[in-house]
Amino acid sequence: MSVKFNVVERGKPGSPETPKKYYPSIVASGKVNQRDVAKHAAEMSTVSIADTAAVVENFLQIIAQELAKGNIVQLGEFGSFWLRTETEGADEAESVRASQITNVLVRFTPGKEFQQVLDTIVFEKA
């Protein structure tokens, strides 16, 4: 099993005079949706596709709800989801307001077993 990559040319953001360099950029081999995940999980167990799909849907909703409460969602050896923000700065601590949060991003940190799978990926040029 391998992951393919293309070569892309990029400059340094904010520094147009810096020479551009070439970098590998992963090429997706396809997409897997919730139904595909549910079907695959059902094939690996004694649970029906419909029941598995319902569990997957609930699971995804719970992750979003817990993140919206400000919680880190730890899923054992799979990893953790947490929120990060993009913000605008203020000159003084007293003048910091919620309106300075310009974007909320979801981050994922893989757990040990997940990372071990990632470490086995073989890359090849597309």
What are the roles of these predicted feature ranges?
Residues 1-126:
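Strongly charged
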